[in-house]
Amino acid sequence: MSKRAFNFCAGPAALPDAVLQRAQAELLDWRGKGLSVMEMSHRSDDYVAIASKAEHDLRDLLDIPSDYKVLFLQGGASQQFAEIPLNLLPEDGVADYIDTGIWSKKAIEEARRYGRVNVAASAKEYDYFAIPGQNEWNLTKDAAYVHYASNETIGGLEFDWIPETGGVPLVTDMSSDILSRPLDVSRFGLIYAGAQKNIGPSGLVVVIVREDLLGRARSACPTMLNYKIAADNGSMYNTPATYSWYLSGLVFEWLKEQGGVTAMERRNRAKKDLLYKTIDASDFYTNPIQPSARSWMNVPFRLADERLDKPFLEGAEARGLLNLKGHRSVGGMRASIYNALGLDAVEALVAYMAEFEKERG
């Protein structure tokens, strides 16, 4: 097999080699059963065991309290932008949202279709280069919930703190930083995460929801979007994304073998520290984000001359450093360094950055 490239894509993102190798080994014949997981009935004993183990391992990794349901749903995180207000926002209620970038803005726009939204704080005041401190937030006392995106994959902003909401349920889009380090799940009413960054392949979204928030859906909420129905049916009201669920379970097993989220925190800290140190030590590369708000998972950076972007990307690809082009709305470069990428990937990237700067700077 040819050497695998280092994939810095924001999503769908790199998966651990060990997970892909195991999936390959089990592709045609899962544990001597003579069929692929893709061919299994989702209601068979074998598949139910696969699904149950995935949930058990995720609960173990994040130490999820027993009064929370873990749902493996379809539609990605973007569908949650509608599903959350349909389940949690009364028609005469108001929801607080924090705007820190493109994904939180999309959530705000969708929620406004279903009810009143109060944008309690916005990073726009800081050109989206910093996160407003909670002393700047204008929260609604009796809000149905407070929503924020813990990490903005495009802009590269990440909360390094959990907001205080005074008993109002806290809802977070954790698509790109879930499982990157330890988390106190009990601080949240609901956590959701699209799988294709730090969990597994696309086609799946994981929702962790406190049980007392179930059963609040509007009467007009579609059956398929009702959290309580999903919970009551073990996320199998209809056929789930079976293979994505299975692969996510393999990722959870791999994470436990690596030492869990505490080990991931050490690994991810080393990666992001090396990359930001390289950028900050250079006059050729820049990252505009306030240091306290810099993302551990998505590191945007610019070259001194944007005319060098194309040759930089071409040189990177020739060295097996893939998908470093920044989002079209931001430009520049972006290195997404999720759990599956090791320190060796970042070491290879910074070595190339130094080489390119020496030649073109």
Curated annotation (Swiss-Prot):
Q: Where, in this chain's numbering, is L-glutamate bound?
A: 43
Q: List the disulfide bonds.
A: none
State the UniProt keywords alphabetically.
Amino-acid biosynthesis, Aminotransferase, Cytoplasm, Pyridoxal phosphate, Pyridoxine biosynthesis, Serine biosynthesis, Transferase
GO CC annotation? cytoplasm
Copy the pathway line from the protein's UniProt record: Amino-acid biosynthesis; L-serine biosynthesis; L-serine from 3-phospho-D-glycerate: step 2/3; Cofactor biosynthesis; pyridoxine 5'-phosphate biosynthesis; pyridoxine 5'-phosphate from D-erythrose 4-phosphate: step 3/5
- List N6-(pyridoxal phosphate)lysine occurrences by residue: 197
The UniProt annotation places pyridoxal 5'-phosphate binding at: 77-78, 103, 153, 173, 196, 238-239
| Location in the cell | Cytoplasm
Task: Provide a GO biological process annotation.
Answer: L-serine biosynthetic process
Co-factor(s):
pyridoxal 5'-phosphate
Q: What class of enzyme is it?
A: transferase
Q: What is its main location?
A: cytoplasm
Question: What EC number(s) has UniProt assigned to this enzyme?
Answer: 2.6.1.52
Note the Pfam families from the entry: Aminotran_5 (PF00266)
Q: Give the matching SUPFAM superfamilies.
A: PLP-dependent transferases (SSF53383)
Q: How does the cofactor bind to this protein, according to its record?
A: Binds 1 pyridoxal phosphate per subunit.
Which InterPro entries is this protein grouped with?
Aminotrans_V_dom, Pser_aminoTfrase, PyrdxlP-dep_Trfase, PyrdxlP-dep_Trfase_major, PyrdxlP-dep_Trfase_small
Could you give the subunit structure recorded for this chain? Homodimer.
Role: Catalyzes the reversible conversion of 3-phosphohydroxypyruvate to phosphoserine and of 3-hydroxy-2-oxo-4-phosphonooxybutanoate to phosphohydroxythreonine.
Cite the HAMAP family for this sequence. SerC_aminotrans_5
List the NCBIfam families hit by this protein, alphabetically: PRK05355.1, serC_1
The name under which this protein is listed is: Phosphoserine aminotransferase
